[in-house]
């Protein structure tokens, strides 16, 4: 488990993923951004080039966000400066009870 530089990044999301999050999971992109940028207790579990981000929105919603770290080539194709860390949102959903328990334990409120 890691905490740190992954949260100092830019975020990108495809139109299709954005639509799916809104219609299937009832999640807005700004909620995902709150988890990534604003939750001081957020943490990630890494698997290959993907990260499962555990976090909470200002309204108290517990979200599990799956992101992929983009390669240098992908970053340049999107028009970001070289060396910028960019996360591509793959999906997000509400945490289940076990995941909320893990989050709260890490946060120190379990």
Predicted region positions:
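Ribonuclease/tRNase effector modules and their secretory precursors
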Residues: 1-110
């Amino acid at each position: 488990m890691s905490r740190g530089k992954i949260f100092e990044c830019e975020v990108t999301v495809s139109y299709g993923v954005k639509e799916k999050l809104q219609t299937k999971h009832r999640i807005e992109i700004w909620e995902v951004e709150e988890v990534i940028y604003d939750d001081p207790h957020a943490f990630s579990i890494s698997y290959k080039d993907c990260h499962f981000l555990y976090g909470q929105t200002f309204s108290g919603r517990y979200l599990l966000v799956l992101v992929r770290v983009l390669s240098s080539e992908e970053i340049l194709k999107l028009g970001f400066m070289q060396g910028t860390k960019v996360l591509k949102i793959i999906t997000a959903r509400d945490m289940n009870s076990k995941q909320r328990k893990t989050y709260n334990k890490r946060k120190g409120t379990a």
